[in-house]
From Swiss-Prot:
GO BP annotations, alphabetical order: negative regulation of potassium ion transport
SUPFAM superfamilies in alphabetical order: Scorpion toxin-like
Similarity comment: family membership: Belongs to the short scorpion toxin superfamily. Potassium channel inhibitor family. Alpha-KTx 09 subfamily.
A Pfam family that the UniProt record links to this protein: Toxin_6
Signal peptide bounds: none
InterPro entries, per the entry: Scorpion_toxin-like_sf, Toxin_alpha-KTx_8/9
Alphabetized GO MF terms: potassium channel inhibitor activity; toxin activity
Disulfide bridge map: C3-C19, C6-C24, C10-C26
Protein's name according to its UniProt entry: Potassium channel toxin alpha-KTx 9.5
Amino acid sequence: VGCEECPMHCKGKHAVPTCDDGVCNCNV
């Protein structure tokens, strides 16, 4: 999942989307 899709990808997981080196991370 790219940075632009990260917020949508993490949505509903009570997570804070962050992006490191182009990699999406959903930090719960």
